[in-house]
């Protein structure tokens, strides 16, 4: 019960503290501080599906401060440059908002929040100044907005610190053990080589859990810098987990063509179940002893899996203790250079930026042309929704959430505006109870992810006259309520009308990147061979899982290419100038497949790559390359021929 009530109490405290401190400091519009506290605390909890872990709210608050400062500077620059042309000024703000949304769609989700804020903060400041009829007051509005927003953020952070936030460390400690057991179960399924569907489900679940563990590492670093050693171990643990998935899947794949790949003694040993991490540790000891005895007949993939699992267990002890990194661990951590993944959603990001610009620009032009009294509220809501919704995996659902919320905010805001707030003017305690009750009920519903709740809370606070002094002008209330509802509805219509058709394009680009990774692994350059692309490849595989849920064929293609990349990266390719030059040629052709725009050219380069792979196989035979090199190259060439149409055009 305490866990359930902690976040509603935290949100209530943040809202009331922001309101009272805002009035005490004589801020002109304390409602901006209250609304900021609600968005920072409520938005974090809505995303987490409950009370967020320690550090998440502070990190989000810092990003909001950074975004607000950037937005204020942008508003001042735009105003100084175009003070004599209000239309140009508003259009530049719309372009700035679209640019920020485009850029935020390309970077890490954790950091994109600051750019989203920077985009609509500039728009809000200029729109507010324009609505008041004094563009020369933009610097004053910028300072006021900064003060109010920072106050709201500090109140949210203070509430988070007082009401004992949860640490994610215990969850990580339990997950690393549970993940090892799941890895052993996947290896059992792959060695048994029976149910293909069950194997697909098992490795798909492991990819998701490994990705989730990587996200937990980011969350842990938000909590405190004292987890630095644990974070380094977790980063390498992510690579080891992905390596184990790859080796297990390759074991299954090899048995399709070589049923006798796994010797009987290994099959018998792998039949024993392991329910806990301690059981897996015992099975690992037995496997290592068997490998030491029969070193000449041990399957290569099984040996690689055992090596990765042994290092996994070693790092797990350090993760739980957070002790100093030993020399042995340091050797594991510095063995490879992790390469970050480039975004494959360039077209998706462009669509998001265009949606934001079109929505805000149309609203600006209509407002300036008609002189609509609700225009400023509509513009503010357009900027907020388009900036926040576009960063979500499903912008349409986020926009619907705001539409539902703004619809509820009209009667709820009217109740507060006409009956509750006027009766609290003589008592600060009654005012705190009224706002606190709104925050408490909203907090209960937000942590359950009740659709429309976050929008309703923000919309209700926005239409209330939490200003200094309070003035109950019913016409102004109607204007604000109507403006923000129309703004949310227009944002929804823009998302529906400007459709995002980049799904197939992104899927094809991802599959071709897997192909390029497999081809580029054929190299004799030692620096290139040290580059660890595995986390980036699985990050893109996770994106593919989200883009095409249930399309198991695409997952199998991607996983097969990742397996090919890992096997070729470890292969003992003969070192000579002829092969090195041909490796560069293969990489160039594979890169052209990704970069060209037309399907005809893409098909031409793909067919050229297949011919070059045939020539490469002849070269390997000529230079007496070992089976560990020729076999994965042959498998890669056959796989590319089989799925040529899928890789060229989804």
Curated annotation (Swiss-Prot):
Keywords: Cell inner membrane, Cell membrane, Membrane, Transmembrane, Transmembrane helix, Transport. PANTHER family: MULTIDRUG RESISTANCE PROTEIN MDTO, P-HYDROXYBENZOIC ACID EFFLUX PUMP SUBUNIT-RELATED. GO terms for biological process: carboxylic acid transport. It comes from Pantoea ananatis (strain LMG 20103). Its main location: membrane. Coiled coil: none annotated. Forms an efflux pump with AaeA. Could function as a metabolic relief valve, allowing to eliminate certain compounds when they accumulate to high levels in the cell. The chain crosses the membrane at residues 7-27, 32-52, 61-81, 87-107, 115-135, 148-168, 365-385, 402-422, 426-446, 450-470, 478-498. GO terms for molecular function: transmembrane transporter activity. Belongs to the aromatic acid exporter ArAE (TC 2.A.85) family. It is a multi-pass membrane protein. HAMAP family: AaeB (MF_01545). It is found in: Cell inner membrane. Pfam families: FUSC. One of its GO terms (cellular component) is plasma membrane. The lineage of its organism: Bacteria, Pseudomonadati, Pseudomonadota, Gammaproteobacteria, Enterobacterales. The keyword Membrane applies. The keyword Cell membrane applies. This is p-hydroxybenzoic acid efflux pump subunit AaeB.
